[in-house]
């Protein structure tokens, strides 16, 4: 058997760029195929032709009978099978090496452009193009190649080709000599004078190895199928996830903590706020001076809107921002549906008036003495 170290070193590099199923497949290939084929199987088939005997003295009869019984040696057949099955993996490895070389070139070019940028050159467009190329080839992480794009397609192609090779070689093996060996082979072929019987050495041992290699081939085929479905499922999942991210971006507008902490937009009439469940209510003893009031929560929306405009106008006047103050006449009239009343809109003659707070409580004596504001019933001194 030849030296398998060169093929082993190449396949060992694929471990860093394979999925979990691919790593298991490589382990099966190394341990149960190459190792067993290089040690036990070769010694079992070492005397294959020399121990093949026929009950005839006719020169050349044994050679033609051996050629008819075994068109190709089992050992050489399995060597060809390993080579063909490993070829797609080697092609995938070649693609990985190509991307790594591409990354080295892009990194050198990027360093040159950054040096030009440090000198004051405008190379932002070229740097962005290099970043796009790295992202396209899956090179956005330094020193690691991501399985995406063309590399992912190459990997899927390698899995499919490996599976096809496994099936084809199993069919060929079954067609040539089946999955077991007989102790006696009958041969009737020129230059044999008549039908002769030929005998094979250690047929049971060889049959065991044939079944073992058959099981390993079926197991490798199963691993390839599982890995193929895993890669395809992951690819579909990533596409659906990326599509959802594009349709529903995570960056939604939300109120700032400053806006949430302000209490200038109050809600009254005993109805809770639609956005903030714990909104400040009116102080006890105070009432809103509104036109017509109902107990329906639908009217609360209209009153809250009027109160908000009044508060906003008062704050603008207090800050002294003349010219930007919004008068009540600019407030838009909102229609609120009601099941029992008709929709009413504000007419130009009925403008919204600021909501005033009416003190329904009598002032205490202490507050009267402490207050420095003149009252109508105060005595003139």
Curated annotation (Swiss-Prot):
MF terms (GO), sorted A to Z = gap junction channel activity; gap junction hemi-channel activity; voltage-gated channel activity
Q: Which residues lie on this side of the membrane: Extracellular?
A: 45-76, 177-207
| Protein name, as recorded | Gap junction alpha-1 protein
Keyword Membrane attributed: yes
Q: What is the effect of changing residue 30 to V?
A: In shf(j7e1); short fin ray segments
Query: Low complexity bias located where?
Result: 360-373
Task: Give the top-rank taxon of the lineage listed in the UniProt record for this protein.
Answer: Eukaryota
């Amino acid at each position: 058997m030849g030296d398998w170290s060169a093929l082993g070193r190449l396949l060992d590099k694929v471990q860093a760029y394979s999925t979990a199923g691919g790593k298991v497949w490589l382990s099966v290939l190394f341990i149960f195929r190459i190792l067993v084929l290089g040690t036990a199987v070769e010694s079992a088939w070492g005397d294959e032709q020399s121990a093949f005997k026929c009950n005839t003295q006719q020169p050349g009869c044994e050679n033609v009978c051996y050629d008819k019984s075994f068109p190709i040696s089992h050992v050489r057949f399995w060597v060809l099978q390993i080579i063909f099955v490993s070829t797609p993996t080697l092609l995938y490895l070649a693609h990985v090496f190509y991307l790594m070389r591409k990354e080295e070139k892009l990194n050198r070019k990027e360093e040159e452009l950054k040096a030009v940028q440090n000198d004051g050159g405008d190379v932002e467009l070229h740097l962005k193009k290099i970043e796009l190329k790295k992202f396209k080839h899956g090179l956005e992480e330094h020193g690691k190649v991501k399985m995406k794009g063309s590399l992912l397609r190459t990997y899927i192609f390698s899995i499919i080709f490996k599976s096809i090779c496994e099936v084809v070689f199993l069919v060929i093996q079954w067609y040539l000599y089946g999955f077991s060996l007989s102790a006696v082979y009958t041969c009737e072929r020129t230059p044999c004078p008549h039908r002769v019987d030929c005998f094979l050495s250690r047929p049971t041992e060889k049959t065991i190895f044939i079944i073992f290699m058959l099981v390993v081939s079926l197991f490798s085929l199963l691993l390839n199928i599982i890995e193929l479905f895993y890669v395809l499922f992951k690819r579909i999942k990533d596409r659906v996830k990326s599509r959802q991210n594009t349709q529903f971006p995570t960056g939604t507008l939300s109120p700032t903590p400053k806006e949430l902490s302000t209490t200038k937009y109050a809600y009254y009439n005993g109805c809770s706020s639609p956005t903030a469940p714990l909104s400040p209510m009116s102080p006890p003893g105070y009432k809103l001076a509104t036109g017509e009031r109902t107990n329906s929560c639908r009217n609360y929306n209209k009153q809250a809107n009027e109160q908000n405009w009044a508060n906003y106008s008062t704050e603008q006047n207090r800050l002294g921002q003349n010219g930007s103050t919004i008068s009540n006449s600019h407030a838009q009239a909102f229609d609120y549906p009601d099941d029992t009343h008709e929709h009413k809109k504000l007419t130009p003659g009925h403008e919204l008036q600021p909501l005033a707070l009416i003190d329904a409580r009598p002032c205490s004596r202490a507050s009267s003495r402490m207050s420095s504001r003149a009252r109508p019933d105060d005595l003139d001194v």
